């Protein structure tokens, strides 16, 4: 995701790149040979802060907050990938920081950036299909493992990966390939599961078109769940209050 975002910033001067696994990031590094490379984002800001106007954050969910919040306090404009944060507290913190430091912020959500999303919103709001009382959303996710138990083995960590930096603020544990580079989405300590990863894409257009606010109730059921990993499948029903008539 980060590499794709950077390709859409081809008109900008990319001065620094940061990734905890330089093997995984090799293709991106080669795309921008003039950019200085880092593993630790804190070191990047210390050394390159004066040369950086804005940052793009596309790390695993659990490290969005620490990187983005620090950047905002340094007066850097931020584009952070969805889901914006790993907790409600972090979202509220971002709101306070952005207001205090007056920087431009945006959450990356490609599902809400296409013309079809705006077109459907216009259709619904103009009454083309009449009143909408019920909407069904679904996804083929997870396409990564979920419903897993905590691994008991501890394979050797690749030399190119700084495991301590990858773990970041999460509870420390031995390296295991079941966590990274892709499967972190299916672990509560690092990701938000299929619902957190995809609802922002497929539910946001509904919120936009129907001008929805907060739900009055949320009821969920799922396959067997545990404290470590989101369930294999789930059904969640959101109920919203009646909307005020426009016009």
Model feature map: region roles:
Residues 1-80, 85, 89-104:
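N-terminal glycine-/serine-/threonine-rich beta1-alpha1-beta2 phosphate-ribose binding loop
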Residues 16-18, 56, 133-136, 167, ...:
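Residues embedded in well-ordered beta-strands within globular domains across many folds
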Residues 60-61, 84, 109-111, 139, ...:
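Short, flexible loop/turn elements at secondary-structure junctions
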Residues 65, 69, 92, 114-118, ...:
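A structural signal for well-ordered alpha-helical segments within the folded catalytic domains
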Residues 77-79, 85-165:
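A contiguous active-site-proximal alpha/beta segment in oxidoreductase catalytic domains
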Residues 97-103, 126-130, 210-214, 240-247:
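Secondary-structure transition/capping motifs at alpha-helix termini
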Residues 164-246:
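Rossmann-like dinucleotide-binding domain that binds NAD(P)(H)
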């Amino acid at each position: 995701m980060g590499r794709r975002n950077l390709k859409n910033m081809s008109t900008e001067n990319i001065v620094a790149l940061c990734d905890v696994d330089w093997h995984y990031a090799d293709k991106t590094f080669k795309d921008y040979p003039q950019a200085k490379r880092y593993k630790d984002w804190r070191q990047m800001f210390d050394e390159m802060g004066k040369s950086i106007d804005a940052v793009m954050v596309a790390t695993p969910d659990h490290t969005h907050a620490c990187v983005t919040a620090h950047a905002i306090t340094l007066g850097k404009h931020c584009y952070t990938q969805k889901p914006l944060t790993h907790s409600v507290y972090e979202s509220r913190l971002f709101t306070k920081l952005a207001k205090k430091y007056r920087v431009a912020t945006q959450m990356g959500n490609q599902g809400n950036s296409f013309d079809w999303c705006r077109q459907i919103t216009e259709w619904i709001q103009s009454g083309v299909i009449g009143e909408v009382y019920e909407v069904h959303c679904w996804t083929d996710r997870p396409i990564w493992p979920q419903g897993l138990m905590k691994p008991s083995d501890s394979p050797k960590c690749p030399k190119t990966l700084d495991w301590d930096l990858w773990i970041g603020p999460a509870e420390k544990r031995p390296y295991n390939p079941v966590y990274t580079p892709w499967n972190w989405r299916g672990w509560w300590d690092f990701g938000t599961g299929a619902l957190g990863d995809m609802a922002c894409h497929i539910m946001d257009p509904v919120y936009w078109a129907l001008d929805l606010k907060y739900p009055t109730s949320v009821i969920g059921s799922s396959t067997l769940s545990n404290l470590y990993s989101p369930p294999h499948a789930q059904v969640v029903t959101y109920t919203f209050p009646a909307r005020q008539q426009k016009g």
